[in-house]
Amino acid sequence: MASKKVCIVGSGNWGSAIAKIVGGNAAQLAQFDPRVTMWVFEEDIGGKKLTEIINTQHENVKYLPGHKLPPNVVAVPDVVQAAEDADILIFVVPHQFIGKICDQLKGHLKANATGISLIKGVDEGPNGLKLISEVIGERLGIPMSVLMGANIASEVADEKFCETTIGCKDPAQGQLLKELMQTPNFRITVVQEVDTVEICGALKNVVAVGAGFCDGLGFGDNTKAAVIRLGLMEMIAFAKLFCSGPVSSATFLESCGVADLITTCYGGRNRKVAEAFARTGKSIEQLEKELLNGQKLQGPETARELYSILQHKGLVDKFPLFMAVYKVCYEGQPVGEFIHCLQNHPEHM
């Protein structure tokens, strides 16, 4: 069997952390081609191109400083050139950019290429919810899997122990992806409920914004625990309404579910920015620049998409926590009123 060529589409904080793992494994395992391409959105860093810095210093100095990437990971500034020979495409870009990237890649991929999405977010289609893996799969005509879990990028790059979940309908492909990405400190469970795994990854960012509001307002640990639990209930309810495939509670007990929700509500960037938003009154855009090096936050954007989908279906009242995050972020509702969505939650009626 010919060795599989791998391309990582994206090179932010999480993309670079995954490149470190995938590059290391591809160099050692016969089933993969050792040369791993990584598409890098070209930027100028102190008069040098970011791709040149990565290919000479083997470090993404902007998005994952202090971590060496394996020398077999090659940064390529042209997405078509990076992806055209790949058998496996790993998608890891902010979800608002995926449509444009798919438009560029369409018609340029190998006939038997497959993809895996590490992107946390949802898209609103004309008929309501669209998962990012569906968007990619439909636009590029390739089978898609997903990887979601309690994986804060800097900790993964530091090789601190964590778990993650791959959702893949084809068991053989799931096993291949596990071989490509598993390490002693990055442990993977493969499940077949792709939709549920992916929806967990998108929705938890909205809950984390709520958790950040709690922290910024000084509400304490009991309130934050309630936000996490009520958020989980809304996640499960939303999945049961909108996933086309089966939705079992067991999937929410995997790393993609409750574990990712907890880590994001205590350690992730959505929580951090939401806390600063509640404390300072600065805009989300301003805080993205100050705290995230200009990287985009997924939680508020996902809340906006959820609002659009739920309003279309007449179900806004069933998801008060999701809707409160939307209203605070986009409609100018005072952040201090966030507590009302908890006090009047349908879970308690």
Swiss-Prot record:
InterPro entries registered for this protein in UniProt: 6-PGluconate_DH-like_C_sf, 6PGD_dom2, G3P_DH_NAD-dep, G3P_DH_NAD-dep_C, G3P_DH_NAD-dep_euk, G3P_DH_NAD-dep_N, NAD(P)-bd_dom_sf
Transmembrane segment boundaries: none
Modified residues (Phosphoserine): S154
Covalent S-S links between cysteines: none
Binding site for NAD(+): G10, S11, G12, N13, W14, G15, F41, F97, A153, R269, K296, Q298
Annotated catalytic residues: K204 (proton acceptor)
Top class in the EC scheme: oxidoreductase
Localization annotation: Cytoplasm
Activity control: Inhibited by zinc ions and sulfate.
Main localization (coarse): cytoplasm
N6-succinyllysine sites (modified residues): K289
Tissue expression per record: Expressed in liver (at protein level).
Keywords of this entry: Cytoplasm, Disease variant, NAD, Oxidoreductase, Phosphoprotein
EC number: 1.1.1.8
SUPFAM superfamilies xref list: 6-phosphogluconate dehydrogenase C-terminal domain-like (SSF48179), NAD(P)-binding Rossmann-fold domains (SSF51735)
Description of how the protein assembles with itself and partners: Homodimer.
Family: Belongs to the NAD-dependent glycerol-3-phosphate dehydrogenase family.
Protein name: Glycerol-3-phosphate dehydrogenase [NAD(+)], cytoplasmic
Originating species: Homo sapiens (Human)
Underlying gene: GPD1
